[in-house]
Amino acid sequence: MLEISSKTNLLEQKSYKYSLQDVAEPNLQRDVYSYGTIPKVAFNHRRVPMSMPEEIWITDTSLRDGQQSVEPYSVDQIVNIYKLLSKLGGPYGIIRQTEFFIYSKKDREAIEKCMALDLKFPEITSWIRATKEDFQLVHDLGIKETGILVSCSDYHIFKKMKMTRKQAMDYYLATVKEAFNAGVIPRCHLEDITRADFYGFVVPFVNELQRLSRDAGVPVKIRACDTMGYGVPYTE
């Protein structure tokens, strides 16, 4: 079927709709990611045209991901870093958002002190696991957007979560609905995407997220996380 593309305004073949490929055993892609050699790069010779957005900005993770590689920050350090991020980003919000942990009393105290500064940028967001209990913390703090950990490789789905692909997808979608119900914009962090079955899980999952977003009239953000650092900068 042909259709006018909303991206190119040209007549194109309608995109194929990928469906979830539920499997009994995990595909760990040992031919690519073996334990004995460096990861291999397979070429598919597909050119992906650049599509530059009208605006480019930074979403900062110094206060969340950054804390996982250094000694944990004190409340005063978090507040000072937040002030510096606002100053660096300027009045137009080049540094548009930043992420916070919310689990400890110290984390929540730091968020409350940063909120009290009433700075326009960077917007304070959080990062949580896909659980109802974590959403309650977000709601109680009055945060409008949160990152949600949605692991998408079979390594994580089968080995860490002890689920099948369908069970994981159903669980994630139910969690996103909880975000909608709480009045929170979900930002889905697709963990370990470079080791995931892209067309058998990632694309069908994102399609379902888009459907939920349309039905609810609430935006859903997607973050592609190259957790293991296996991504390459070229498209072919």
Language-model segments: residues:
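Alpha/beta enzyme core
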Residues: 23, 48, 53-58, 70-94, ...
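N-terminal capping/small domains of soluble enzymes
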Residues: 2-132
